[in-house]
Amino acid sequence: MKHRLNYLLVGCVLVLAVACFLSVSRPLTFERQRAEREKVVMERLHIIGQAQETYCRQHGHYAESLDTLVRNGLLADSLQFVPYSDHERFSLRTTVEITPSGRSLPQMECGAHYRQYLHGLDEAAIGSLTEKAEQTGDYPGVKVGGF
């Protein structure tokens, strides 16, 4: 009876040790995967930003859609989709601001939300990141440009 109780206690200790290890390793794994994915997404956003700059120099304003960049041969078709997402496109917003001196100032913002490029990872961690960004007034993901 005494040996059986000792085995049971050892089993409980092992289960608690594994649970403790997982509680520490899960957030670390998420952060590592997030950093890897953000690097890939930022590289793609940089390419889109360069294509937009080229389009703006040619036309005087930014392209209103990624399809326009693809049709003009400035962007490969596959680059308009967010990596790791379920074939979702980057969000794109453009505008032309008129300065007080009357000069036109084209602006654009292209980005991907956390839920897009962190698809398939810990949903609670993604929700926490999104909530934190929204509370601080930041973009809930990564982007280039802005208004």
Task: List the predicted regions and their residue ranges.
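Short, Lys/Arg-rich N-terminal segment immediately upstream of the first membrane anchor
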Residues: 1-5
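Amphipathic alpha-helical segments typified by the pilin-like N-terminal helix
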Residues: 18-40
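Hydrophobic membrane-insertion alpha-helices, especially the h-region
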Residues: 6-24
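Low-complexity, acidic interaction segments enriched in glycine
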Residues: 53-147
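N-terminal alpha-helical signal peptides/signal-anchor transmembrane segments
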Residues: 38-59
